[in-house]
């Protein structure tokens, strides 16, 4: 545990929102995002005293959350769960679309359709304002890989968005 409760509360207050947004972007599930965020803070509470440099708490939290996400994803791949009742699909709550512009909605949809390494890199850079160096530490890859994933991810996103606009134009003409 950090040296006192106020330090821990300060870290939670400072990083809960961006950490949760990152988890939500990765998992696409509010429940999973909340679990991942809580687990990251639990581990921080247990191991913060072992951090040599307390200024690295932010990077440590994002790295821990990302690794937990990957571990959960591997587990879910090996042990897929089956739905007990298909009527639960009707009860899934979606984000209120009226509050999100059509462009933002299309961008989020395109982002979620991207492959994992590109999605997480774009989320960390644009949604959480991490530097290349911080992203490299969080994802455990070289800075050059981060730069490459950002460039390729932006191009993929641009292509998906252009295709979506073209499809919408075709539908509007019909």
Range-by-range predicted roles:
Residues 71, 79-108, 131, 170-174:
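Internal acidic/polar
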């Amino acid at each position: 545990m950090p040296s006192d409760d106020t330090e821990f509360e300060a870290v939670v207050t400072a990083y809960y929102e961006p950490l949760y947004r990152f988890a939500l972007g990765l998992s696409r599930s509010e429940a999973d995002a909340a679990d991942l965020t809580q687990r990251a803070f639990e581990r921080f509470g247990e191991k913060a005293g072992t951090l040599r440099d307390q200024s690295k708490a932010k990077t440590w939290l994002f790295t821990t959350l990302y690794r937990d996400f990957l571990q959960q994803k591997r587990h879910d791949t090996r042990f897929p769960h089956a739905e007990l009742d298909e009527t639960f699909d009707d009860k899934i709550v979606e984000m209120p679309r009226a509050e999100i512009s059509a462009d933002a909605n299309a961008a989020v949809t395109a982002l979620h359709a991207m492959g994992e390494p590109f999605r997480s890199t774009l989320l960390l850079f644009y949604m959480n304002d991490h530097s290349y160096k911080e992203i490299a530490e969080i994802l455990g890859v070289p800075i050059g890989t981060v730069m490459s994933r950002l460039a390729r991810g932006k191009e993929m996103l641009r292509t998906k968005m252009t295709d979506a606009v073209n499809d919408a134009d075709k539908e509007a003409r019909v």
